[in-house]
Amino acid sequence: MFGGGGGMNPRKMKQMMEQMGIDMEDIDAQEVIIRTPDEELVFDDAEVQLMEAQGQKTYQVVGEPESRELGSGEGSAAAEGDSDESDSSSGVDEDDVELVAMRAGVDEDTAREALEANDGDLADAVDELE
């Protein structure tokens, strides 16, 4: 992007980036976790940089990750908690039930029934109850 840049003065490089509207910032991260469908990549003491250009933020993580299967380690409690979010008999998310109940001013059982009747569509459930 900057034509080699191998011998470029870091101060000059920073000045050029500022002129182009690119802002970089180091983030003091203790741990970075990237969760994929199959595993977690855990970076301890990773170097993290935030680069903001044209209103878009990009995070760069540098370090050696430790790979662990989902469901092991610290993240497993959060992952198991997510599975309890939906009611096993209806498949309706509890957060959705609470939101519909609050918006429509009804109890959670009524909100759950409305969500089930509307295939989980929040707007239709609220409209039906109002």
Swiss-Prot record:
Write down the PROSITE patterns for this protein, in alphabetical order. Answer: NAC_AB (PS51151)
Domain spans labelled NAC-A/B: 7-74
Instruction: Give the UniProt keywords, A-Z.
Output: Protein transport, RNA-binding, Transport
Biased composition of type Basic and acidic residues is found at 105-115
Which GO BP terms apply? protein transport
| UniProt entry tagged with the keyword Repressor | no
Superkingdom of origin organism: Archaea
Q: Where is the composition biased (Acidic residues)?
A: 81-98, 116-130
- Pfam families, alphabetized: NAC (PF01849), UBA_4 (PF14555)
Query: Carries keyword Protein transport?
Result: yes
Q: Where is this region: Disordered?
A: 54-130
One function term, GO molecular function aspect = RNA binding
- Known role: Contacts the emerging nascent chain on the ribosome.
Family label? Belongs to the NAC-alpha family.
What does the subunit comment say?
A: Homodimer. Interacts with the ribosome. Binds ribosomal RNA.
Q: Which HAMAP family match?
A: NAC_arch (MF_00814)
NCBIfam families tied to this protein: archaeal-type nascent polypeptide-associated complex protein
Task: Quote the protein name from its UniProt record.
Answer: Nascent polypeptide-associated complex protein
Q: Which organism is it from?
A: Haloarcula marismortui (strain ATCC 43049 / DSM 3752 / JCM 8966 / VKM B-1809) (Halobacterium marismortui)
